[in-house]
Amino acid sequence: MNKFEIINELSNIEELVEVKKVIDYALKTEKINNVIFNIIIVDNNYIQKLNREYRKIDSPTDVISFALEDNDDINYSPIRLLGDIYISLDKAKEQAKEYNHSLLRELSFLAVHGLLH
């Protein structure tokens, strides 16, 4: 059984209900089981601070993942604590407009991308 939460640090985003369904589908399709993780929706300022502190890049990014386990731990634990996936809503909106698709598609892409890292 998988357990994840989408934590929205910003305003109400109706697309997040559908993003959750996309993540459930990706987990099932990729046969990823017994994992726990969070997806945290933040703004450009917050994700830039994370990017600067942990990657030494002083600019916002669209998604950044923090793993709680090393790959070596995967085979030994019945439940895997994957960690946290931070997504910049500002970047997601910019990129959805740039690529001429919906915010739902962009948020879903970023969430799955962050999960599979």
Located regions from the model:
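An acidic/histidine-cluster motif and surrounding catalytic segment
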Residues: 1-107
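Active-site His/Glu-centered metal-binding helix of metallohydrolases
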Residues: 107-116
